[in-house]
């Protein structure tokens, strides 16, 4: 209300209050003080590595082929989108071998892999290109070798056997092991005579030559006895085998053997028959 042409206190205070309320509102909306690294990040737009559209789309992104300058190493072909579908198949198809690609100015075309049924993929084998066969050398089967059987006579004359033998002009000769009896030319073994001499201990020392002489004497005596006993066997005409009786008669009739073996008694050898000649039936010639 106006009175006496002067404004009231309320009308004067209203604009002041409005200014104060505006200042209070501004102070309430002021953001707190932030560090410089957060203030910089405010103006940088946030970008995600993967867009929302990539998760929503079911099909994978198509690979982009970049043109490259020809290099000495052969460039490998990139697979197309059909390769992703081939991985989800129940049985993976076997790779096909191809001839090595030569370096060219044009980029290689992507290789397409065709899907096959499980039955065909199991029976299919890796195919090789015709150029790989042409590069290989022509292989012919080896001819069968004929084997000849040789007789024993031809084997001895073969040069392989001659090489294994010792040379003709060899200085060393093969030594044949022989006993002392064979070297002395005796049938009675000298080693056995030596064993008996050393076992009976007739003397303290036994020379190696004494055994040889004793074996020679024994062999001579045995030969004499056998010769005389054969003569007695031929006179008896009753048996064809030398017996004790024949040996005893041969010793008693021989002068040297009877003097040597006078004290020897031969079992079942008998005695000399001492019959008077008048009792004997003499023949007409006697």
UniProtKB/Swiss-Prot annotation:
GO molecular function: DNA binding; protein heterodimerization activity; structural constituent of chromatin
Entries under SMART domains matching the protein: H2A
Region feature Disordered, mapped onto this chain: 1-180
InterPro entries xrefs: Histone-fold, Histone_H2A, Histone_H2A_C
GO cellular component: nucleosome; nucleus
Coiled-coil regions listed: none
A biological process from GO: heterochromatin formation
Gene3D superfamilies (alphabetical): Histone, subunit A (1.10.20.10)
Residues that span the membrane, as ranges: none
Biased composition (Polar residues): 1-26
A Pfam family of this chain: Histone_H2A_C
Chain intervals with Low complexity compositional bias: 44-59, 76-104, 115-138
PANTHER family (UniProt xref): HISTONE H2A (PTHR23430)
Sequence similarity: Belongs to the histone H2A family.
Name this protein carries in UniProt: Histone H2A.v2
Organism: Dictyostelium discoideum (Social amoeba)
Protein encoded by which gene: H2Av2
């Amino acid at each position: 209300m106006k009175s006496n042409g002067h404004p009231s206190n309320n009308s004067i205070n209203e604009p002041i209050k409005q200014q104060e309320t505006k200042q209070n509102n501004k102070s309430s909306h002021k953001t707190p003080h932030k560090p410089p690294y957060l203030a910089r990040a405010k103006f940088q737009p946030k970008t995600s590595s993967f867009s929302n559209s990539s998760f929503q789309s079911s099909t994978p992104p198509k690979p982009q082929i970049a043109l490259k300058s020809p290099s000495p190493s052969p460039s490998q072909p990139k697979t197309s989108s059909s390769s992703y579908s081939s991985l989800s198949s129940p049985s993976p198809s076997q790779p096909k071998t191809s001839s090595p690609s030569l370096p060219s100015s044009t980029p290689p075309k992507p290789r397409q892999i065709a899907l096959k049924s499980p039955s065909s993929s199991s029976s299919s084998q890796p195919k090789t290109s015709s150029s790989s066969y042409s590069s290989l050398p022509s292989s012919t089967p080896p001819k069968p070798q004929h084997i000849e059987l040789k007789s024993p006579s031809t084997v001895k004359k073969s040069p392989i056997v001659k090489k294994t033998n010792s040379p003709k002009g060899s200085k060393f000769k093969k030594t044949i092991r022989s006993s002392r009896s064979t070297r002395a030319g005796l049938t009675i073994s000298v080693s056995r005579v030596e064993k008996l001499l050393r076992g009976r201990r007739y003397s303290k020392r036994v020379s190696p030559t004494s055994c040889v002489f004793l074996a020679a004497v024994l062999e001579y005596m045995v030969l004499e006895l056998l010769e005389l006993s054969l003569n007695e066997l031929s006179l008896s005409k009753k048996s064809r085998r030398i017996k004790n009786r024949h040996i005893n008669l041969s010793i008693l009739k021989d002068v040297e053997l009877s003097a040597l073996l006078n004290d020897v008694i031969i079992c079942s050898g008998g005695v000399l028959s001492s019959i008077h000649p008048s009792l004997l039936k003499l023949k007409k010639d006697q």
